[in-house]
Structure formats: structure tokens, C-alpha cells
Amino acid sequence: MSCRLPERIAATCLLASLALPALAQHPEALNWCDALAQRLRSVEAESCRKLGMEPGKLRSVQGRPLMIRDVPAAPVKLSALKTESGKPVPQRPARIFIIGGIHGDELTSVSIVFRWMDWLGEAEARHYHWRIAPLSNPDGLLARPSRRTNGNGVDLNRNFPTPDWFAKALPYWAQRTGKDPRRFPGEKPMSEPETRWLHEEIERFKPDVIVSIHAPYGILDYDGPAQEPRRFGRLNLNRLGVYPGSLGNFGGVHKNIPVITIELPNAAAMPSPRDQRLIWDDMLAWIRKHIVPHTLS
């Protein structure tokens, strides 16, 4: 199988398209995986336990672990790698942070991340360093019925510390949404442990691109530098605008990190297997072409 890197590296590629090995099970991952498997038909508890999920330092409002998976890039002999134009390959692989389940009632935003984790062992994906938070709002997902907000009734995607938060977040909520409780931004930015956890992961990991999964608008949204993606699979670019306290505003506008928001077409029913694959392949193609690490480390 051919290996594709920026400008199609014309050197021997040592990355194998193999499944990643099963990792040690953290004790907290056992109950976490069981709970997800009971809620989502697409998640198998036994497979989930083998992913090597680790709890973060913070917990959700209701005390549930906030789980993360770290998948470093496969090692390569950097001295042998050059692009077709003769340029050396950046020595630090691009870092990609995937975030699912910010809104607990968008079930497919969690399910598709688990599907994509099955493909991280393939050659193309192994060129990159991945950090994956498949479920950022466990209290919302595991509520009966599932809800958009977290355990405090806060919309986590309006709770990030954007520079305009104090001036605009609460007025926007009151005037533009009619104080819709599903879109309450909180009393202050980062009031919620889930938001603080994601913020800390971004600061620690220093991603070159953030991919946030939502539903059900069936589009792509984009904030930040780099050439915007035009299409992933059947999802076409349709920029939704910038909201006070949103992840796209915080990451893409304030932190200057490319933020892709993938809006799946249905919050409860997964895209077809073919469409899941097309979104993934087009995302990797865009990353390969447009995302280069800002610094070497």
C-alpha cells in the first residue's frame, strides 16, 4: 500500500497499515465503556476497553470521568524523508485533536469518533499525532433523555473564554435565543469542568488542527487560518458564523488554530459506512495538503 505524506514523500515509508495494538485498560475505562455501550448501539464495550482511554484530571459536573486517548505518530527515519520538491519533512508530526459529544443529544457525534478510531492504525493516519476526546459531555449523553447541555444546564459550546464573552455571551443568549435553556452559556466563561478540561487539553497538546463533531445540519463549518475545506464526503462548506463562547471562535479566531466543525446530517442515525469513510478520507487529504506544524519539537 502506498503511503501519502505532504507532497507525496518520495522516500521509503516505514509505516505499516496495521491495527494498533490493544492497550492496557484503565480501571475507570471499564465502567465508562459499559455505560457508553448501553447508550450507543454503535459502541461495543469490549472493543472500547481495548482503546487505552485515560481519564483526565477533571471530572464532569456529575462526577463522571472525562476520557481521552492519545495516539502518537508512528516512528519514521526522518533523515530519509523528503518531499517531491526536495524539502525536508517537518520533524514533528502534525497534531490533530478530535472532539466529539460536546452536545449530549448529538449521539452520532460520539459514535463516528469511535468508528474513526478503528482506522487510526492505517498508514495515512499514522503520519499524525492524534488526541481524541470522543465524549466531552458524558452527563448530557447519559441523561434520560439525552440533552444538549451538561449537568449544570450549560451549553459547553458557548462556555469557552473568547475575548467577547463578557460583552456578548449573555446578551446574545437573551436577545437572539430568547433565553433558550438549551443554549445557556453559563454565568462566566469556563465555569464548567468539561470546558476547563478541553481548554487544558488544547493548551497542553498544542494541536495544529481541531476537529469538532456535531449534528444535525449536514454541513462543514470552519474557523481559523489555513485554506478552508470545501467538502468532506457529502458535507459541503457552509459557514455558520461566529458565536460568543464557541469552540470555533475560541480556537479558530482567538487562538489561531484551524477548527473544522463537522455537522453530521442526523443526530441519531449514523451516515452510511461509505459516507463515514468519505468524510474521513477527505479530512485526511485536507490535513495532508494544508496542515503543517507551526513549530518543531
Positions of PLM-derived features:
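Active-site-adjacent mobile loop/cap segments within catalytic or ligand-binding domains
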Residues: 219-223, 231-232, 244-297
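Short glycine- and acidic-rich boundary segments immediately preceding or forming the N-terminal edge
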Residues: 24-69
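Short beta-strand-to-loop junctions in surface cap/lid or active-site-entrance loops
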Residues: 68-92
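Bacterial N-terminal signal peptides that target proteins for export
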Residues: 2-10
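N-terminal signal peptide c-region/cleavage motif recognized by signal peptidases
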Residues: 19-21
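Active-site/substrate-binding loop(s) of hydrolase catalytic cores
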Residues: 83, 92-93, 97, 106-239
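Conserved beta-strand scaffold positions in the cores of enzyme catalytic domains, especially
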Residues: 55, 68, 132, 210, ...
